[in-house]
Amino acid sequence: MSAELEEIGSSLIDNKIPAPWAKVSYPSMKPLAAYIVDMVERLVFMKKWIEEGAPSTFWLSGFFFTQSFLTGLKQNFARKYTIAIDLIAWDYEVMNDATFNAGEGAEDGAYIYGLFIEGCRWDADQGCLEESQPKILYTKMPHIWLKP
């Protein structure tokens, strides 16, 4: 067995992502088992998109390279309104998940989800960031409408 295969085997036994996999993968600090679950979720999201068309909301943290997705949104907006892409800036609106309905998706831009914030929480009633609850470091953000 080669040294590389031995290293991969050791990583698998230690529940770590093997170095050759990590070189061609998205960044992850998760142990191997959680990494595989996460990767399967990403593949299911992409497969559903391919088979059923664009979703009404996009799992932003499920993308390997989010910058290309955001650039694609800008390109679509620029083509639709014949505007130079470098003149387009982002605005956003944090949605209230209690009343949010994506329907067919955003007319322009995209609804996104899957973002987390550290050391604070989103107060839907006030529409702003608040102190986090005791002993809670990360909180999930509601859907966000990215508007070019």
Kindly give the residue locations of the regions a language model identified.
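Long C-terminal appendages of very large multidomain proteins
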Residues: 1-148
